[in-house]
Structures are given as C-alpha cells and as structure tokens.
Amino acid sequence: MKPNFSKGLLPAVVIEEGTKEVLMLAYMNEEAYEKTLKTKRTWFYSRSRRSLWNKGETSGHVQHVQSLYLDCDQDAIVVFVKQVGPACHTGEKTCFHYKII
C-alpha cells in the first residue's frame, strides 16, 4: 500500500511511540515520504519555503521513525517516532502545548 499523492501534499501526524503523545503535524510530498522511508528519519515539505526539510537537521532534535500508517483513503499519514529532544521549534516537547478547553 502506498500513499496517494495525486492531490498534492499529505498531512503527517507525528506521534511519540512510547507515550502516544501527538508531537506535531507537518506535510509530506512524495519525495519527503521516500526520504523518510530510506533514512528512517522524518522529512517534510515546507509549504512556506516550498522545499524539503529534515526534522532536527539543524537543532539535533531528530525523529527516529518506528512505524508509518496510512489512513483508509491513503491521503494521510501517521508517523510513530522516537523523539530526541523537544519536537517543537519553540523548545516545547510537543507543538500542541496550547490548551484551549
């Protein structure tokens, strides 16, 4: 089974394998997906910069991929990782640290 990139970018939900905590949401194009499979580290496509980026490449806060899952429509990805350091660029453990209710 392979993701369907025919409509463009796919959302990728990144989850810490041990705690099952949602760490971040990013987007993958086909190249980012293939690089993720090959390197076992997360690669994403930046919509603002219009380029690939490797999570932790500059900060050292890398994500070691443990498993990937596709949804039933093959247009969304869940990535289970072992996170090194904080996942958020703000220094927070997760990008989802603002509680609303």
Curated annotation (Swiss-Prot):
InterPro entries: PRA-CH (IPR026660), PRib_AMP_CycHydrolase_dom (IPR002496), PRib_AMP_CycHydrolase_sf (IPR038019). GO terms for cellular component: cytoplasm. This is Phosphoribosyl-AMP cyclohydrolase. Binds 1 Mg(2+) ion per subunit. Mg(2+) binds at D71, D73, D75. Zn(2+) binds at C72, C88, C95. Homodimer. The gene is hisI. The lineage of its organism: Bacteria, Bacillati, Bacillota, Bacilli, Bacillales. Keywords: Amino-acid biosynthesis, Cytoplasm, Histidine biosynthesis, Hydrolase, Magnesium, Metal-binding, Zinc. It is found in: Cytoplasm. It is an enzyme of class 3 (hydrolase). It comes from the Bacteria. Belongs to the PRA-CH family. Disulfide bonds: none annotated. SUPFAM superfamilies: HisI-like. It catalyses: 1-(5-phospho-beta-D-ribosyl)-5'-AMP + H2O = 1-(5-phospho-beta-D-ribosyl)-5-[(5-phospho-beta-D-ribosylamino)methylideneamino]imidazole-4-carboxamide. Catalyzes the hydrolysis of the adenine ring of phosphoribosyl-AMP. One of its GO terms (molecular function) is zinc ion binding. It comes from Bacillus anthracis. Its cofactor is Mg(2+); Zn(2+). The keyword Transport does not apply.
